Amino acid sequence: MKNSYQQLTTNLEYLKLKQMAQHLGDVVDFSINNELSFVETLVKLTNYEIDVREQNMIHSMVKMGAFPHRKEVDEFDFEFQPSINKQQILDFISLRFLEQQENIVFLGPSGVGKTHLATSIGIAAAKKRTSTYFIKCHDLLQNLKRAKIENRLESRLKHYTKYKLLIIDEIGYLPIDPEDAKLFFQLIDMRYEKRSTILTTNINFKSWDEVFQDPKLANAILDRVLHHATVVSIVGQSYRIKDHFSKEND
């Protein structure tokens, strides 16, 4: 016949409370030595389970975000890019912009850190259990085009609209045909004033009509993107070129 301690361990394992079962002995000893109350003991024991589950949830949310890398804001070299307001980026990391369904646009040449910063904000959001998804513009349009051919466009648009934060990377790096531009507009329109979107682009807004090959459609997209948006213009050298020369010097 099991004693009470053994039965409690069995019960915790049966309920799949693995961390509580694993730390039960240590918590009981700590409770006795420090004269904790029954409630205080339970709080300490359940905290082990909650901490692990929270970490697992964070890991899952970050993984679901499909980020290209795990680069966070503390890895960004603000000294190399002095045109960037560090405090502004840290404010983005606080996720205050999500509460107002505001957008962020990172504008600048290739290699200046647009994707790094967008990813950093996305990871911060995912860690706060905010539904977040990262996708390159070309891949997004290919997915929407395929969905349209397969008569499931509405479902796919709803899929990308459901994320509280959607990050669309590299707008303008590849040409966008008129039909794809219409698909892009549909998504932006569905998210407008309902969800936050982060965009990265190397194309000045005046040239978006060339990217989307339709001035009216480009203006409609810009109108919805920029209405509640903060634009971060980055002027500086490429990190990749800097790293290349650093390796040559080594």
Swiss-Prot record:
Signal peptide: none annotated. ATP binds at G108, P109, S110, G111, V112, G113, K114, T115. NCBIfam families: IS21_help_AAA. It comes from the Bacteria. This is Insertion sequence IS232 putative ATP-binding protein. Belongs to the IS21/IS1162 putative ATP-binding protein family. InterPro entries: AAA+_ATPase (IPR003593), ClpA/B (IPR001270), DNAC/IstB-like (IPR028350), IstB (IPR047661), IstB_ATP-bd (IPR002611), P-loop_NTPase (IPR027417). One of its GO terms (molecular function) is ATP binding. The keyword DNA-binding does not apply. Pfam families: IstB_IS21. Keywords: ATP-binding, Nucleotide-binding, Transposable element. One of its GO terms (biological process) is DNA replication. SMART domains: AAA (SM00382).
